[in-house]
Amino acid sequence: MNNIMIGRFVPGDSWIHRLDPRTKMIGTFIFIFVMLWSTSWATYAWSAAFVVLAIRLTKQPFRLYWDGLKPIFWLILFTVVLQLFFTPGTPVLLHAGPLKVTIPGIINAIYVMIRFVLIILMSTILTLTTPPTSIANALESLLKPLKKIHVPVAELSLMLSIALRFVPLLMDETQKIMNAQKSRGMSFSTGGPIKRAKAIVPLLIPLFVGALQRALDLANAMEVRGFQDATQRTKYRVLSYGSNDRSAFIGLIGFTIIFIGINFFIK
């Protein structure tokens, strides 16, 4: 559970850390968007090289990102299996009832796995190098035009900030409950999938109670400090673009242009 990196910020002084959070968020959104249009090995190789370069620029060990992939391994595997057995095409390599393994299915499964991993790694770069409050402030700034149509942008960014802070707290709380139950003889790693699923059920009630208690404590703390309206909040750190952000946007534009060129000319 402690390997889940969503919502965890690792302080640092790398080039990526110093970027404006809006730059990192825009870059992540653009990367995810272009990855959904990737149709060749060349575009996946180019995207993988871009992600590896971004990780190197964070000056953080790659093991940190690899550990972040482990908790969602089964989700990736499930998605890959669906693509492998349910993608139509020819030739058929294996046929067992309604399940078919085809060459297009294998290729599509590999593409989906690579796409999944690269998108998660890029999203992890954003969360590991940007504090949750900065992510929320960046989102509020980017969505500011929606205020004209009465979208509660400030409240949405506040909710995102709180949610991102709660994710690692809930994971740590889950690990504590699991350790306490293991000390009483409970096993979470033995038996089949059904037995393991049943072993997780006793975790839910104390975890749910703990989450409610943390939410109540947070609400009381905000009320004591006089918090009333998110729209009236001031910012301790004002967001501003710098020379690093201009360089990042140039690099991002270059990546996108090359990606489109590869995707268009290499199939």
UniProtKB/Swiss-Prot annotation:
Membrane-side (Cytoplasmic) residue stretches: 1-25, 93-100, 172-246
Membrane topology of the entry: Multi-pass membrane protein
TM spans (from-to): 26-46, 72-92, 101-121, 151-171, 247-267
GO cellular component: plasma membrane
Subcellular location: Cell membrane
InterPro entries: ABC/ECF_trnsptr_transmembrane (IPR003339), EcfT (IPR024919)
MF term (GO), any: transmembrane transporter activity
Keyword terms of this UniProt record: Cell membrane, Membrane, Transmembrane, Transmembrane helix, Transport
Record-stated family: Belongs to the energy-coupling factor EcfT family.
Its job: Part of a common energy-coupling factor (ECF) ABC-transporter complex. Unlike classic ABC transporters this ECF transporter provides the energy necessary to transport a number of different substrates including 5-formyltetrahydrofolate, pantothenate and riboflavin. Upon expression of the complex plus FolT in E.coli allows 5-formyltetrahydrofolate uptake; 5-formyltetrahydrofolate is not taken up in the absence of FolT or the EcfA1A2T complex.
Subunit and interaction comment: Forms a stable energy-coupling factor (ECF) transporter complex probably composed of 2 membrane-embedded substrate-binding proteins (S component), 2 ATP-binding proteins (A component) and 2 transmembrane proteins (T component). This complex interacts with a number of substrate-specific components, including FolT, PanT and RibU for 5-formyltetrahydrofolate, pantothenate and riboflavin respectively. May be able to interact with more than 1 S component at a time.
Protein name: Energy-coupling factor transporter transmembrane protein EcfT
Organism: Leuconostoc mesenteroides subsp. mesenteroides (strain ATCC 8293 / DSM 20343 / BCRC 11652 / CCM 1803 / JCM 6124 / NCDO 523 / NBRC 100496 / NCIMB 8023 / NCTC 12954 / NRRL B-1118 / 37Y)
